From Swiss-Prot:
PANTHER family: HISTIDINE--TRNA LIGASE, MITOCHONDRIAL-RELATED, HISTIDYL-TRNA SYNTHETASE
UniProt source species: Ralstonia nicotianae (strain ATCC BAA-1114 / GMI1000)
Gene name, Swiss-Prot/TrEMBL: hisS
EC number in record: 6.1.1.21
CDD domains: HisRS-like_core (cd00773), HisRS_anticodon (cd00859)
Protein name in UniProt: Histidine--tRNA ligase
UniProt record similarity statement: Belongs to the class-II aminoacyl-tRNA synthetase family.
Length: 432
């Protein structure tokens, strides 16, 4: 029978890769605890209109990349979430989470976009994101950026570059938009099809081009930062001042606009030159209009999302993957009664907090002690516990160090009822 393959662009996480993901996850959770953020979990599937209204009807995500379908039971238009912010904000509004004041929230999980799979860009991908809701000052903009820097430090990542821009407020963007359209109309003969399509619907996105032929044109375009009013300038200067005070280097990029329509004021991206074209590993900014757009009472908001797969790849690229950790104990056994005692011993050791692999029979055969020891050594376990019929008859077990112990060849026989204490003593002595 023909094998059924996975969906292209939706990848399996295999056991050999899981420790690095767990390492990243632990670092993220530790950092988030340090800043007082609380986790929120939302469904993978949401109403399509949430993303149309929240992300923007003329964005690439909504126009071309969403996995949407009609619910056969009730005809609802549903979408597998392409990003996490709109869903988190929907949950905040629906459950009235801001009733008692601002909130610091975070989420993690798979996102889905229908696009051509390539390095660093997948149809199912994972994000970690934070949402700081109800905070209006530049201090929270700086805080969410500092969170990223702390995570890079905790993971050992260096060389990531921070780019900043301000998109100002709606009226400032409107004035800039009018002048920008006039400017771009003079280049219609060189605009590609995407740029022509965006010219009158989302002209800011024309500037965010990766097309080398258009980058010179984009460099000469009117800069939104020159249209900022006094309050927007003060906010942006406040963010910069706080970053400088914390020794965070950054570059102001007037063409940085992000791919989602809900941003205003501060936007930022963290980038690397080590992942090819998909060099953005995290990005975010302020999105004060979004809560009202989705149906809530107006409230300021700021946050970011980072691509987990890209950071995992960067950790591998930089040889920052942690050393594999084996179990504490591998139990080998031979004989029917020994099998029973081995299972009892394994549970006692687990009760004491140890990680234990119990050798299990394959195809009805338990294998010789020699073959079991090969598996024990390959497992990475620190100690083997040996139980055979002779040990059962004598009420003892044997403990053999497999690695790390200077007396690695020393095998000791201990009473069965002392196994836990003697093994823990050996592990403590070996760790000194």
């Amino acid at each position: 029978m023909q094998k059924i393959a996975g969906v292209k662009g939706m990848n399996d996480l295999l056991p050999g890769d899981a420790p690095l993901w767990e390492h990243f996850d632990n670092a993220v959770r530790s950092m988030l605890r340090a800043y007082g953020y609380q986790q929120i979990r939302t469904p993978i599937v949401e109403q399509t209109q949430l993303f149309v209204r929240g992300i923007g009807e003329v964005t690439d995500i909504v126009e071309k990349e969403m996995y949407s379908f009609t619910d056969a039971l009730n005809g609802e238009q549903l979408t597998m979430r392409p990003e996490g912010t709109a869903a988190a904000v929907r949950a905040v509004i629906e459950h009235n989470l801001l009733y008692d004041g601002p909130k610091r929230l975070w989420y993690t999980g798979p996102m889905f976009r229908h696009e051509k799979p390539q390095r660093g860009r997948y149809r199912q991908f994972h994000q970690v994101g934070v949402e700081a809701l109800g905070f209006a000052g530049p201090d929270i903009d700086a805080e969410v950026i500092l969170m990223c820097q702390r995570l890079w430090d905790d993971l050992g990542l260096v060389g990531l570059k921070l780019e900043l821009n301000s998109l100002g407020q709606a009226e400032e963007r409107a004035a800039h938009r009018a002048d920008l359209i006039k400017y771009l109309e003079g280049f219609q003969d060189i605009l590609d099809e995407d740029s022509k399509r965006r010219l009158y619907t989302n002209p800011l996105r024309v500037l965010d081009t990766k097309n080398p032929a258009l980058q010179e044109m984009a460099a000469g375009a009117p800069k939104l930062i020159d249209y900022l009013g006094e309050e927007s300038c003060a906010h942006f200067e406040g963010v910069q001042k706080l970053l400088k005070a914390n020794n965070i280097p950054f570059t102001i990029n007037p063409r940085l606009v992000r791919g989602l329509d809900y941003y205003n004021l501060t936007v930022f991206e963290w980038t690397t030159d080590k992942l090819g074209a998909q060099g953005t590993v995290a990005g975010g900014g302020r999105y004060d209009p979004l809560i009202e757009q989705i149906g809530g009472k107006p409230a300021p908001a700021c946050g970011w999302a980072m691509g987990v797969e890209r950071i995992i790849e960067l950790l591998r690229e930089e040889n920052l993957a942690p050393e594999p950790q084996g179990s504490d104990v591998y139990i080998v056994h031979q004989g029917d009664e020994a099998q029973v005692q081995a299972l009892v011993a394994a549970e006692r050791l687990r009760d004491a907090g140890l990680d234990v692999i119990l050798h299990a029979s394959a195809e009805g055969r338990n294998g010789s002690f020699k073959s079991q020891f090969k598996r024990a050594d390959a497992s990475g376990a620190a100690y083997a516990v040996i139980i055979g019929d002779d040990e059962v008859a004598s009420g003892v077990v044997q403990i053999k160090p497999l690695r790390g112990d200077p007396n690695a060849d020393a095998q000791q026989t201990v009473p069965s009822d002392q196994l836990v204490d003697r093994l823990i003593d050996a592990m403590v002595a070996n760790s000194d």
